[in-house]
Amino acid sequence: TLLTTNCVYAQTQGFFISQKQEKVADIPKSYSPYKQPANTPTVQVVADYNRSTAIVSKYLYGNNANPYMTNIVSQPALINHIKLLSPQILRYPGGNLSNVFFWNALPRQKPSDVPDVILYGDKRKIRPEKFWYGRDEGKNTLSLKNYYATLAAANSTGIICVNYGYARYGKSLHPVQTAAHLAADWVRYDKGRTKFWEIGNENYGTWQAGYQIDTTLNKDGQPRYITGELYGKQFKVFADSIKAAAREIGAEIHIGAVLIETAKEKSWEGAIEKGWNTGFFKTAGNAADFFIVHSYYTPYEKNSTAQTILNTATVETQKIIAYMKQMSADNHVELKPVALTEWNIFATGSKQMGSFISGMHAAIVLGELAHNKFGMASRWDLANGYNNGNDHGMFNIGDEPGVPRWNPRPVYYYMFYFQKCYGNQVISSAVSGNDKVLAYASKFSSGQTGLVLVNKGTNKQTISIKINNFKPGKRYYLYTLTGGDDNGEFSQRVFVNGSGPEYPSGGPANIATIKPLSASVADGIKIESPPYSVQYVLIENEK
């Protein structure tokens, strides 16, 4: 079945699962006894061990690093958290700043053909640009050297976003070739360490450097505003240059193109966004090795409710993959592996981003990414800025009141346990009894079964679990994650099997040593699922 699955589902995963995706379950060495609920189950989960529906890419658990996180290599507390999390892949340098980042430049030494002022398409004031430099070794930035050191410390690989904007705003006679050459030199410097490369970040956006240029400074006849067609044409120049560099050093690399993730049909979405994908494929054809999409799931800067947030995790993820398939067919191009290189929520006003609800959302997203056969994903981001609780960062960068620097937010715990308890193959599953309960079932190459159950309802449920065509071992293990009673429905705290944080936000300090609850499988598997909770279940196999 493994071979068949590889063949059938290769299109949206491709080279992201080309290496062996074996995964051995980490069976807990100690546990606390779990007394199964005595009442009749209200929800039934049935999975089929023999029916594998997808390979789980190990690159779904990624995250984003960025220069303004500061020199994190010198922060042992954070590095230890990242090691435990084991994100597998970390993206760099951004984010929006990718298009104003010069990987080989010393501080304040931008190339001479870069203007002091960069134009954008939004309403920001025109002022000298803040550029970023890969050789800035100051304590307040993450240099390229220290990014590579972070990857080594976290036992993760990289995905690098090169500066595409430079091809637009550069003042040289041949700005596209100059920018492509700079990117190719990075590939040479990288020496094969990084296999995945992105050509720019959200280049269709008014907020990007390169969206609008001063045509009086341009010397190769480029238009004032970018289009998908122009990006496609210039993408091919980058791809040719970068792949030539990779061949020189004998490296295998894959190059991604920036695409729009869903159909843009709203009145305020402009012609550039609406025509982006069609324009790109018109000039680039099948030149991209993978498709890059971003999603922030919830309505932009709206005070969304918990139910709204949790519902987007399934709806939007499924919508993205369906759109990638339809869009490829409509444009008569090959469907390529799909990489969600930024994702989070846009909900603001009630500290939603740092809440346990955001953690639950992440658990659902990971389950949907696996089920819908995404090749790769990296959440935005490791650290950002508190901004009154509107903070995408997984860790406190140091400005959250009453909380130590690098304290993990609840989402850290939800993503940690997901990777710990979810195997390397998706198996089919069905839920009956309540439509607020979701189940993501899997198996490990070492034989065990792992499930992630999400109760996104406001009522307690008793869930029975049955795995067909599976011979269980003696025990199953359980981690239940719940929120606290602070901040309305957006608690900033998470509890693991009842163990909680010592600070106003985050979770228990001893994540690596928290014992699971455990019971014998002799009487079947039945667990209690509190309102707004996630259960991570690991079931031993018969030896």
Go through the PLM ranges and name each one.
Residues 1-11:
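Bacterial Sec-dependent N-terminal signal peptides
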Residues 11-286:
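N-terminal catalytic cores of secreted or lumenal carbohydrate-active enzymes
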Residues 63, 86, 186, 197, ...:
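Conserved, mostly hydrophobic/aromatic
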Residues 68-72, 97-101, 167-169, 204-207, ...:
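Flexible loop/turn segments at secondary-structure boundaries
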Residues 227-362, 372:
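Noncatalytic carbohydrate-binding groove/subsite architecture in carbohydrate-active enzymes
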Residues 339-422, 426-439, 445-446:
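Aromatic/acidic polysaccharide-binding cleft in carbohydrate-active enzymes
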Residues 435-474, 478-486, 532-538:
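Carbohydrate-binding surface patches
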Residues 472-525, 529:
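Acidic, Ser/Thr/Pro-rich beta/coil linker or hinge segments at domain junctions
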